[in-house]
Amino acid sequence: MAKKALNKLIKLLDLEHLEENLFRGQSENIGGPRVFGGQVIGQALTAAVRTVPSKRFVHSLHAYFLRPGDMEYPIIYDVERTRDGGSFTTRRVVAIQKGEPIFDMALSFHKKEKGPSHQIDMIDIPGPEECISELEVKKKMIDKVPLKYRDFFLRERPIEIRNLPGEGMFEEPKKKPPHKHVWMKAVGKIPDDVVQHQAILAYASDMGLLSTSMNPHRLSFAKGNVMSASLDHAMWFHRPFRADEWMLYSTDSPSASNARGFNRGSVCLLYTSPSPRD
């Protein structure tokens, strides 16, 4: 069943080509009328890639969510070919539903080049094998969920998530520092394609990010004492990676004010498998 959920996500991110620079995507049911923001980011990235010269891969993207997406309607992705330079390519993608833009994203792509390289070390925390899966946490609290929602609550998801003890989204809300660490990976093998791994990480990057800024305020989705939505989202891709191997997603929230929370995250990799081919 878990592999079925991943195959469904891969299909969801594989857009229908309508005509030059125009693509159409469908939406998944996440338990409400709105479209999941990570889905739109991943689909918009896929649309942009379809217009980019080969051997150039996204290194940064900056997006704004303009309106809530409606799960019942397809999404049209309109790609603007802003610039094709000697080393860099720039694209803009507008996602449209019912004649109105719901999302706007700028992306920059870069060909492989040699240069200086460094990175920070991974922090010393318990590994994924020492953490309990989010699904197991849900099973322990299923008695608190209304009967009609239980099957959906326990549904298989394409991304496996393991929280450090006391840091899960479904923990009893209590005042905590505005940071957390999550192990995540796709539940099955992803084809050796850089773009698919990037699109799936883009999808996963919007999972649980918002709740980081709620930690100091005893707010929790599990308690239903807060409503939230993403306003914008940015990502930087520094190196090739595999989204089907364990990744540590460390998030923190430097500030929350005026009914807005600022959340940021970094991804460190824990694997020895070869990265996807260029």
Predicted segments, located by residue:
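Low-complexity, intrinsically disordered Gly/Pro/Thr-rich segments
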Residues: G261-V267
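Short tryptophan-centered beta-strand motifs in secreted/extracellular beta-sheet-rich domains
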Residues: Y77, Y249
